């Protein structure tokens, strides 16, 4: 047996009890007129974008101000001593400068021209007369210095000052070297291609001649065994 529904009086009473103290919601204006929409006077920024006073413009000014502050801080900061004496090369040319320094260092090692700081700071003899007097005097041991020993002490060979190449000249030389290498590879490829085509042409020609000889037939339409035997004998003689 299905459950019976509650009576209408209980239902109405229940809703009435629940809705006590709650105002009824009304949609729209009570007078029936529509309100006109007006923008919010409390905007997030002043002015308008058309006048150039929008939020993007203010943000740009703030970024410019921060950048100027950073520049002033960098200018006022004292330069460190290490930065004054260390060589700073641009990143895209650093490898060229380092390679040039390494080449000069190796050249000095080979020629034996690396002089110590004491030899460089030592003053040279002022007058030739003083050298003659010292050479005429004999040492207490009775040993006379040889002329070769005197020459080695006085003569100092300095490396030839070669003009350093600029980064543009080095880049130009590198470009020319790469272009020459590419041209040599291209020429070699063309030569191999011509040789391969010539070998294929000769091979096809030889095969066609052999096919013409072996494909000949007699008047009755049978293969000509005499020509085939002659061709085989000729081939054996060539190989032997």
UniProtKB/Swiss-Prot annotation:
Pfam families: rRNA_processing. Its main location: nucleus. One of its GO terms (cellular component) is nucleus. Residues 104-181 are annotated as: Disordered. Keywords: Nucleus, Transcription, Transcription regulation. Residues 131-149 have a biased composition (Low complexity). Belongs to the TAP26 family. Component of the transcription complexes of the pulmonary surfactant-associated protein-B (SFTPB) and -C (SFTPC). Enhances homeobox protein Nkx-2.1-activated SFTPB and SFTPC promoter activities. This is Thyroid transcription factor 1-associated protein 26.
């Amino acid at each position: 047996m299905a459950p019976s529904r509650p009576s209408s009086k209980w239902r109405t009473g229940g809703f009435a009890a629940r809705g006590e103290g709650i105002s009824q919601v009304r949609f729209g204006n009570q007078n029936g007129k529509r309100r006109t929409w007006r923008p919010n006077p409390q905007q997030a920024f002043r002015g308008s974008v058309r006048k150039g006073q929008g939020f993007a413009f203010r943000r740009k000014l703030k970024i410019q101000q921060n950048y100027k502050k950073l520049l002033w801080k960098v200018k006022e900061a004292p330069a460190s001593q290490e930065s004054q004496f260390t060589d700073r090369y641009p990143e895209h040319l650093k490898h060229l400068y380092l390679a040039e320094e390494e080449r000069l260092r190796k050249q000095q090692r080979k020629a034996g021209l690396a002089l110590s700081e004491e030899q460089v700071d030592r003053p040279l003899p002022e007058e030739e007369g003083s050298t003659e007097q010292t050479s005429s005097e004999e040492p207490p041991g009775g040993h006379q210095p040889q002329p070769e020993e005197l020459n080695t002490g006085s003569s100092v060979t300095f490396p030839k000052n070669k003009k350093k190449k600029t980064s543009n000249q080095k880049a130009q030389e590198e470009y020319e070297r790469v272009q020459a290498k590419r041209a040599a590879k291209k020429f070699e490829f063309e030569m191999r291609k011509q040789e391969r085509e010539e070998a294929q042409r000769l091979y096809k020609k030889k095969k066609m001649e052999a096919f013409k000889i072996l494909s000949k037939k007699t008047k009755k339409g049978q293969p000509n065994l005499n020509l085939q035997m002659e061709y085989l004998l000729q081939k054996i003689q060539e190989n032997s």
